[in-house]
């Protein structure tokens, strides 16, 4: 996965990621391996914009792109930092989806203005495999758009960036079925109607779920792009 620099901005090549997935599925089919299901997780915050016809409007911005520098301060002039944090419980960082979307809104971005749906990266890849649009809870939580108490998209924050819940896919939690491989993907890969299941779409969430702890009294340290330490709780602290 490599950044693409075009016109002074950094993007992800989601079609390359899709091609890599297809190549992997072809290899599995060639080996005759049995697949019970497919799940996709990725890094957080980044997203794609889809038009009314379901097609990609633009390659997704990469969170390392500098277009969101100063974005939190601009947003907090309308809704306070404490209110945003109180609803979401997410660390304020300029590249969170909330601030990416608000930056696009303030700049009258043509892709956002034409967008019918917003899909986070793992959900976009699942959509390309199944034709089904969903918004998985853990990946949506990285956006700073999910209310940690209701575990749903927060209407006030959506309104602030000019969106509604209808602009996102069906809200799902890990373990729910998204769909099955489309006939096109089946034909390309040589696989059958394999189910695609929502996992913790945020890769850190999937990593924590896989911690081989024997009881609930444990802490985790997940090291990837950076290191995150925490504990599992039944409700927000």
Identify what each model region corresponds to.
Residues 47-73, 115, 119-154, 191-237:
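Glycine-rich phosphate-binding loop of actin/hexokinase-like ATP-binding domains
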Residues 72-78, 93:
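Flexible glycine-/small-residue-enriched beta->alpha junction loops
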């Amino acid at each position: 996965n490599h950044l693409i620099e075009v016109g002074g901005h950094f993007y992800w090549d989601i079609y390359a990621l899709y091609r890599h997935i297809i190549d992997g599925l072809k290899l599995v089919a060639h080996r005759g391996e049995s697949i019970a299901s497919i799940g996709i997780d990725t890094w957080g915050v980044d997203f794609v914009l889809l038009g009314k016809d379901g097609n990609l409007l633009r390659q997704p911005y990469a969170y390392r792109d500098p277009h969101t520098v100063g974005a939190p301060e601009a947003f907090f002039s309308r809704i306070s930092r404490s209110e945003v944090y109180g609803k979401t419980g997410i660390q304020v960082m300029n590249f969170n989806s909330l601030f990416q979307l608000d930056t696009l809104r303030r700049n009258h971005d043509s892709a956002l203005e034409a967008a019918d749906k917003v899909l986070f990266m793992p959900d976009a890849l699942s959509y390309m495999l199944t034709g089904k649009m969903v918004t998985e809870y853990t990946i949506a939580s990285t956006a700073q758009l999910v209310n940690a108490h209701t575990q749903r998209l927060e209407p006030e924050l959506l309104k602030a960036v000019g969106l509604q819940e209808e602009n996102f896919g069906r809200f799902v939690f890990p373990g729910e079925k998204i769909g099955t491989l489309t006939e096109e993907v089946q034909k390309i890969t040589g696989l059958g109607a394999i189910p695609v299941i929502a996992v913790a779409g945020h890769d850190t969430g999937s990593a924590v779920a896989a911690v081989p702890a024997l009881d609930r009294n444990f802490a985790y340290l997940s090291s990837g792009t950076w290191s995150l330490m925490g504990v599992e709780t039944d409700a927000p602290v």
